[in-house]
Amino acid sequence: QAIDELAAHGLIAMLEPFMSSRVNGKVGNDLTPDAVIKSMHISQGLGATSAFTWMKLPVVPEMDRVMDATTLPTLLLGGDPADPDEAFASWEKALALPSVRGLIVGRTMLYPPDDDVSSAVATAVSMVR
């Protein structure tokens, strides 16, 4: 209902779908490509229209296959990477995919391992088209 109401007003719904489960009493997200695709397929079916619906997705292995499974515009989530250089490389590769429109990053920019926020932000900005 919320997605329909947003669309009726020409407002964007940003969906951040995950397949989650409890392991040892803690909720965890399944970040396999197949799980991300499944969560997207479920989310894409919400509402009477997807005209104003965007996805917010984690960068996972096989992002080209993941993005082939949707026509919706998508923003990439930064996640909590252990290796910033690896994260930047995976973001750059994913940003080249046609329906990826940008990044939504937080901790990676605010708390880089080397404490150089300016450099981390500059690196991310250089990737966005």
What are these regions, as identified by a protein language model?
Residues 1-72, 82-102, 127:
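Alpha/beta enzyme core
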